[in-house]
């Protein structure tokens, strides 16, 4: 969609789609609005509660990675039949996960919609919550992108790396392993990592950033 849609309307797009977030300048100010859309069907299928948290955190990371302070989210929740106990259970746990993450990160859900009965015959789709997030950049000149700027740039990892591969593309597509839980979410660490990265971007100490998801 983003390859076909005219994303340069009025010439205010300063970071095009395809990165962590798209960014649009606000006319007459130094401010800019960042936006991202994320989903987590595989994680939610493996563990709906954790998957719900994951998709909110993914949006949170994508906005922060361009230098935007996350402001609010909307959602589109796609599930199978609510008359099926398993599908309804997935829905309840996923919504709980979204709520817990949004509340802790102070990243409120301001709108959304639910789509049930997404199925073929009696088999429902994987639980698929989609999150649209928006964030604010106070000075668009401080916005950053994910690409390296110089040959000798130093690469830093913010946060813990625990080597989790269950439910990853590598596990599913290379190892053909479909079982196992998604990565655990530590909301305290998510918030602290995000705030740290925003401070680094605002101070001009880093030139590029990209989330690891």
What are the functions of these language-model segments?
Residues 1-213:
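Glycine/proline-enriched, intrinsically flexible loops and inter-domain linkers
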């Amino acid at each position: 969609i983003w390859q076909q849609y005219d994303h340069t309307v009025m010439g205010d797009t300063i970071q095009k789609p395809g990165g962590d977030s798209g960014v649009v300048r606000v006319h007459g100010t130094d401010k800019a609005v960042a936006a991202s859309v994320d989903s987590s069907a595989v994680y939610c299928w493996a563990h709906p509660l954790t998957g719900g948290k994951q998709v909110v955190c993914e949006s949170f990371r994508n906005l922060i990675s361009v230098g935007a302070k996350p402001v609010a989210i909307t959602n589109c929740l796609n599930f199978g039949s609510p008359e099926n106990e398993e599908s309804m259970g997935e829905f309840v746990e996923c919504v709980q996960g979204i709520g817990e993450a949004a509340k802790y990160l102070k990243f409120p859900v301001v709108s959304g919609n639910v789509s049930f009965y997404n199925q073929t015959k009696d088999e429902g789709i994987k639980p698929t919550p989609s999150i649209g997030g928006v964030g604010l950049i106070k000075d668009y000149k401080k916005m950053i992108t994910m690409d390296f700027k110089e040959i000798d740039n130093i690469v830093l990892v913010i946060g813990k790396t625990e080597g989790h591969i269950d439910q990853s593309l590598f596990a599913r597509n290379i190892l053909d392993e479909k079982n196992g839980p998604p990565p655990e979410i530590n909301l305290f660490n998510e918030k602290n990592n995000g705030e740290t990265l925003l401070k680094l971007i605002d101070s001009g100490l880093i030139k590029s950033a990209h989330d690891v998801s």
